[in-house]
């Protein structure tokens, strides 16, 4: 964690100087989060209909610095990601004990170029993920952890590289890979690959229907993630998504990383 923070500073601080080509930016995020990918910053909630659990996402990704090139269609940015995804248990009287929480932070670099037949973009992230059980996973009356699962160390530092192509503004396909350069437990695979796509269609000027899917080869079980719904607002800007979701494969939560998780449900995200 300390190494990741220091590397972040070493990359950012030299750019704050008035070097030619670099400047701070307050423009919208250049590489939009992958809709079906779990490991993206979001603000929202998903209800698991089959087991009455909830997933709460809190986080954001911001571009901080941009590089100006002579090519009018090419853009390069550097930014940061900070978010958590939390597993909650649904109980009566609107009680939602926190079972497990995973947090991710790091930084990213993205590049986009407008070609004659579409937009080619790429994003490289260097991130840290850590996972923890919380008091909702503990049985206070017996003094034991629930389901016989005690807390265990789960931590990883990794590179995540995505290449995407959008032939039109409402269609995007992508491929990517993870390289885990430090991981605990060490039995986890160091390489993972994924591929996916997104499609949206305007219904009115402020309402868009969409669908998205991602397949991830994790080295444990393949993970399938599907999402379909509508968005109120600008498709590439601020708005609110309401959607149906399907998940099949290993759990996204580090404390449950070797346990199969299959659910369907409904959710919403607020795109900032």
Model-predicted segments: where are they?
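Short loop/turn motifs that connect adjacent beta-strands in outer-membrane beta-barrel proteins
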Residues: 31-35, 65-78, 114-120, 166-171, ...
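Outer-membrane beta-barrel "beta-signal"
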Residues: 226, 259-272
């Amino acid at each position: 964690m300390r190494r990741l923070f220091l590397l972040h500073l070493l990359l950012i601080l030299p750019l704050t100087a008035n070097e030619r080509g670099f400047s701070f930016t307050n423009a919208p995020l250049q590489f939009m989060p992958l809709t079906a990918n779990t490991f993206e910053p979001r603000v929202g909630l998903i209800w698991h209909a089959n087991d009455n659990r909830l997933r709460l996402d809190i986080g954001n990704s911001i571009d901080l610095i941009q590089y100006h090139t002579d090519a009018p269609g090419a853009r390069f940015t550097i930014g940061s990601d900070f978010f958590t995804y939390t597993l909650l248990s649904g109980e009566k009287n609107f009680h939602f004990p926190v079972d497990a929480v995973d947090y991710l932070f790091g930084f990213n670099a993205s590049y986009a170029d407008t070609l004659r037949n579409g937009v080619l973009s790429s994003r490289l992230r260097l991130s840290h993920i850590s996972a923890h059980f919380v008091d909702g996973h503990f049985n206070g009356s017996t003094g034991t952890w629930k389901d016989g699962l005690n807390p265990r160390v789960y931590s990883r530092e990794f590179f995540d590289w995505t290449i995407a192509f959008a032939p039109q503004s409402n269609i995007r396909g992508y491929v990517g890979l993870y390289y885990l350069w430090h991981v605990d437990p060490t039995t986890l695979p160091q390489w993972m690959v994924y591929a996916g796509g997104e499609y949206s269609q305007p219904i009115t000027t402020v309402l868009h229907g969409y669908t998205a899917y991602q397949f991830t080869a994790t080295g444990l079980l393949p993970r399938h993630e599907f999402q379909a719904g509508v968005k109120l607002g600008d498709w590439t800007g601020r708005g609110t998504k309401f959607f149906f979701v399907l998940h099949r494969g290993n759990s996204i939560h580090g404390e449950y990383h070797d346990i199969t998780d299959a659910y369907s449900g409904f959710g919403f995200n607020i795109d900032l």
